[in-house]
Curated annotation (Swiss-Prot):
High-level lineage: Eukaryota, Metazoa, Chordata, Craniata, Vertebrata
Keyword Secreted assigned: yes
Main location: secreted
Keyword Iron: no
GO terms classed as biological process: defense response; regulation of blood pressure
Subcellular location per the Swiss-Prot or TrEMBL entry: Secreted
Processing and modification events after translation: Isoform 2.2Y4 differs from isoform 2.2 in not being sulfated.
Source organism superkingdom: Eukaryota
Record's GO cellular component terms: extracellular region
Name listed for the protein in its UniProt record: Caerulein-2.2/2.2Y4
Modified residues (Phenylalanine amide): F11
Keywords per UniProt: Amidation, Amphibian defense peptide, Hypotensive agent, Pyrrolidone carboxylic acid, Secreted, Sulfation
Organism whose genome encodes this protein: Ranoidea citropa (Australian Blue Mountains tree frog)
Positions bearing Pyrrolidone carboxylic acid: Q1
Function, as annotated: Hypotensive neuropeptide.
Amino acid sequence: QQDYTGAHFDF
């Protein structure tokens, strides 16, 4: 999962 919201990196 790639949630590039600001500085959110959830792989």
